[in-house]
Amino acid sequence: MAFDFKKEYKEFYMPKRTPSIVTVPKMNFIAVRGSGDPNDEEGGYKQAIGLLYGIAFTIRMSKKSSHQIDGYFDYVVPPLEGFWWQDGVIGVDYTNKDSFQWISVIRLPDFVTKEDFDWAVTEAAAKKKQDFSKVEFLAYDEGLCVQCMHIGSYDDEPATVQLMHDFMEQKGYELDITDKRLHHEIYLSDARKTAPEKLRTVIRHPIKVKGR
């Protein structure tokens, strides 16, 4: 049976609908950076998702290629994730989507090296006749965070975020969003096929002990 990150690491991908504190270890990702409204059908976000999955599936199917990855095992491609920010805003202003800056990512299994990643970019570009130059290998050490499962529309996320922040403060922590530590979302539902009120999204914010 294929390894499923969501099931094997439930503390990171399947939190409860009540906030919790978690320490997230360093992970490697396929990443594409961009800006603008993610709902724009002609925008960079939709293109970025296509690039991410192009590399993700090239790596997953590498077992059938001449490039054999050391330590490879069958796995389910992890869910799409995103880091979001806006210049001059702490957190996220959902009413002004045009000002979004984002890094769209998909997690890589630990056995994938930078060399394996570079092979996948070259392989995907040759096979799909696409430009994959925007895709990068991102190592990210998220650390101490508060997180919660949000059920519902993306536009309703502020209510869940407020629950997270209230919980965080009760536990003696404070928000630690910086230019390196960002608002993080993990998308467990396909927005194209799921009613808005049923969308499942993990929301995660970086925190630190209050006063430190």
Model-derived features: where do they sit?
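A solvent-exposed interaction/effector surface
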Residues: 1-212
